[in-house]
């Protein structure tokens, strides 16, 4: 054992934290007999809960007891729900009561809390399983007593609000020993009908014992398994039943359920009238804008005298046509002149041009070009090409001229060529 010394406060805080960390003590249900009850002027209630073998100090603060539907007294058998903690100043453990159920109803409240906790752990109450109600149901099944005021209120309200909806009454007992099984069977029967859109399950108000069938597990599971959406409508506004938690929608009263399940035809007519007015107004503004647009278009010069615009465009087209012809002709002329210049250049470089000035092109019989008199011999046959034809010649005689000789012969030949060109 540790020899470290602690203070009373430290030990008390340690024990307090131990109790707070214990999950089983955070939401505990305790049954016992009230003794030493005191309702303090502050509004808080102080009492002891006891049985044959032990007693437990309890406190129920004002913000928890203000809505109790009974007055606790000594000797009363109750079930309380709360958290176990330590009152540090006195060093005593006690129960901080959150809820209290009166004599005779304690077992029912206990059963209610236990079933609620069980189904909650299974996830049956989760929002992910809630089905959406159709906006305009065609057929509604009502599972309730055929003789109570609740069914009359629902039928009258549904017929008044949305007469297009048909109602199927499935009569069942809503209190007593066999009520739960009949309610479950009624829900199952409604689901066997293909065209049922919504199921209303409920009754008018009553005591806890009277509405107890709606706190049973078989009714809860029937609601959860329903293919059609279910509205729970037990006529009690302050407390909830298990059916309220598991259903797709909870209504505080049967009449409220009827108002929730169908739209109000008066409101629908008002909405249709409003939509009609808005549509008419939108169409009128659209028509007016289009009409104004037409007036503006008709007021334009092109619409007043379209032939003037056509005549102007025709003149522009003719002008562009003439301009195009001039440009094409000018471009053609430039290309033709350039072509003629190139032809003249090519012609000036042509051998035929030289032959046309009196020269000839000489080849041997084998086609070799004769560049000098030394390339031929007597009796050779030569081919002479002129600018306008050719001829074959036989060499009878050849004469050689030396380069060193007087240039007079060359000048004479040049003068002869110039005379020939002038001619």
UniProtKB/Swiss-Prot annotation:
Catalysed reactions listed for this entry: Exonucleolytic cleavage in either 5'- to 3'- or 3'- to 5'-direction to yield nucleoside 5'-phosphates
EC number: 3.1.11.6
GO molecular function, one term: nucleic acid binding
GO cellular component terms attached to this protein's record: cytoplasm; exodeoxyribonuclease VII complex
Keywords: Cytoplasm, Exonuclease, Hydrolase, Nuclease
Keyword match tRNA-binding: no
SS bonds (residue pairs): none
Keyword Transport: no
Compartmental location: Cytoplasm
Pfam families on file: Exonuc_VII_L, tRNA_anti_2
GO biological process: DNA catabolic process
Subunit details: Heterooligomer composed of large and small subunits.
Function summary: Bidirectionally degrades single-stranded DNA into large acid-insoluble oligonucleotides, which are then degraded further into small acid-soluble oligonucleotides.
Family (UniProt): Belongs to the XseA family.
Protein name per Swiss-Prot or TrEMBL: Exodeoxyribonuclease 7 large subunit
Native species: Natranaerobius thermophilus (strain ATCC BAA-1301 / DSM 18059 / JW/NM-WN-LF)
Gene name linked to the record: xseA
